[in-house]
């Protein structure tokens, strides 16, 4: 398997996630090229890739993360840094209170949720 020629895959405990940092960096270079040529900012979706041991490499190329809830957002804050964007279909007031302290963007699921939490989130962020 390309990128793993020096690794005895049969000796690894299972289940296990194995990441080739060389191949990951090749992909990150492609994403960086897209960012530079388009002006877009690409975020790491933690739902799809939350291997925090690779975050030091990934954060060299990507501006921040997108999280689908409080736990992923806390992971981003502790291990990734950068911009933290959060979406959740049903935030609680406690989650909004925490997220307002560090999240750069909170995306609400509906107008009703925005109406319910927007003023509270703003007040938490200013505190």
Q: What role is predicted for each listed range?
A:
Residues 1-18:
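Generic N-terminal amphipathic, Lys/Arg-enriched alpha-helix
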Residues 2-4, 26-31, 35-49:
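N-terminal glycine-rich anion-binding loops that anchor highly charged ligand groups
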Residues 6, 11, 31-36, 58, ...:
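Short, well-ordered helical secondary-structure segments
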Residues 13, 18-19, 50, 92:
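Generic, ordered loop/turn and secondary-structure boundary motif
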Residues 16-19, 34, 42-44, 64:
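Broad hydrophobic/π-residue packing in well-ordered secondary structure
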Residues 17-18, 28, 75:
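Generic preference for hydrophobic/aromatic residues in regular secondary structure cores
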Residues 23:
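Active-site anion-handling motifs in enzyme catalytic cores
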Residues 40-127:
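Active-site-proximal beta-alpha core segment in soluble small-molecule metabolic enzymes
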């Amino acid at each position: 398997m390309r990128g793993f020629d020096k690794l005895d895959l049969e000796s690894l405990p299972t289940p296990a996630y194995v990441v080739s940092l060389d191949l990951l960096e090749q992909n990150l270079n492609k994403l960086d090229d897209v960012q530079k040529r388009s002006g877009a900012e690409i975020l790491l979706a933690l739902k799809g890739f939350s291997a925090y041991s690779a975050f030091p490499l990934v954060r060299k190329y990507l501006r921040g993360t997108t999280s689908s809830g409080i736990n992923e957002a806390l992971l981003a804050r502790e291990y990734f840094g950068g911009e933290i964007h959060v979406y959740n279909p049903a935030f609680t007031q406690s989650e909004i209170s925490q997220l307002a302290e560090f999240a750069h963007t909170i995306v609400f699921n509906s107008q009703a949720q925005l109406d319910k939490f927007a003023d509270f989130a703003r007040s938490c962020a200013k505190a």
